[in-house]
Amino acid sequence: MMNKKRRKKKRVCQFCADKNAKIDYKSTQRLQKYITERGKILPRRISGTCAKHQRELTVAIKRARNIALLPYTLD
């Protein structure tokens, strides 16, 4: 048997691809995509964002949680 190496297609960061997309703590619909059903922030390898935008997302999600736009946990 031959072991075939699988090559995954490199995911492009959604925010790098769309220059008009801004990461804002007030846009809760966009931030909801990067939170699990338990309320945790998705890691880069799952969300597909670059390091720069992942940091910005984390800050925006934490700000939104702080002013009660997003919940800390989801039940």
UniProtKB/Swiss-Prot annotation:
One Pfam family matching this protein: Ribosomal_S18
GO molecular function term, any single one: structural constituent of ribosome
Gene Ontology biological-process entries: translation
Superkingdom of origin organism: Bacteria
Stored Gene3D superfamilies: Ribosomal protein S18 (4.10.640.10)
GO cellular component: cytosolic small ribosomal subunit
Record keywords, A-Z: Ribonucleoprotein, Ribosomal protein, RNA-binding, rRNA-binding
Cross-referenced InterPro entries: Ribosomal_bS18, Ribosomal_bS18_CS, Ribosomal_bS18_sf
NCBIfam families per record: S18 (TIGR00165)
Summary of subunit composition and partner proteins: Part of the 30S ribosomal subunit. Forms a tight heterodimer with protein bS6.
UniProt similarity note: Belongs to the bacterial ribosomal protein bS18 family.
Role description: Binds as a heterodimer with protein bS6 to the central domain of the 16S rRNA, where it helps stabilize the platform of the 30S subunit.
UniProt-recorded name of the protein: Small ribosomal subunit protein bS18
The species this protein was found in: Clostridioides difficile (strain 630)
Higher taxonomy: Bacteria, Bacillati, Bacillota, Clostridia, Peptostreptococcales
